[in-house]
Design a protein with these regions (language model features):
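Arg/Lys-rich amphipathic alpha helix in sigma70-family domain 2
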Residues: 61-68, 78-97, 164, 170
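Structural recognition of an alpha-helix C-terminal capping motif at a helix-to-coil junction
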Residues: 36, 50-57, 70-82
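A short pre-motif secondary-structure segment
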Residues: 133-137
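Residues within the DNA-recognition helix of helix-turn-helix
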Residues: 30, 161-168
Length: 182
């Protein structure tokens, strides 16, 4: 991870000097993580792909404003967060997973089918703020401070959202896990 941060810092410096190929390499480092993050927020592969393209376009247009290359991951995910929430505002009634079986298919290699359905349903029952905190921490591996930057809220709020969400998930999934392990 440290090597990646050093390499990304070098690429960012090159992009700021006008090296487009360096930005293409930077995209290749981050496109899957950004896409997966957006996919977990939107539940729609097409929207996630479109949003990913918008995220990287905005990142390219604004990378000169990034003062600290070490903050690139949280800066990039902040752009992704903003783009997703902009889409949600435009489509208020449509927010949520369009294909209820999608999450099950994606996680099939991690869980038993029964538990996969239970996890999907439990995540869907979290409010949007809690779900996003879980996605950023559990699925994307961000630290509390980075999530705080991405969501523009205090670290204490991030922790509260995450702990509340995890407690809700634990309580909801305990019966499902007991069924899935039989």
């Amino acid at each position: 991870m440290i090597f990646r941060a050093v390499e990304d810092a070098d690429l960012i410096a090159r992009v700021k000097r006008g090296d487009v190929e360096a930005f293409n390499v930077l995209i290749s480092h981050w496109e899957k993580r950004v896409y997966n993050y957006l996919l977990r927020l939107t539940g729609n592969p097409d929207d996630s792909l479109d949003l990913s393209q918008d995220v990287f376009l905005k990142a390219y247009q604004n990378i000169r404003k990034l003062d600290d290359a070490a903050k690139f991951p949280s800066w990039l995910f902040r752009i992704a967060h903003n783009e997703a929430h902009s889409l949600f505002r435009k489509r208020k009634p449509e927010v949520g997973v369009d294909d209820p079986d999608f999450v099950e298919r994606e996680r099939a290699h991690w869980f038993s089918p029964d538990l996969t359905l239970a996890v999907s349903a439990a995540l869907d029952r979290l409010n949007a703020d809690q779900r996003e905190a879980v996605v950023l921490k559990v699925y994307q591996g961000f630290k509390f401070e980075e999530i705080s930057e991405i969501l523009s809220c205090p670290v204490s709020t991030v922790k509260s959202r995450l702990y509340t969400a995890m407690d809700l998930l634990k309580n909801e999934l305990a019966p499902a896990n007991a069924r899935g392990s039989r």
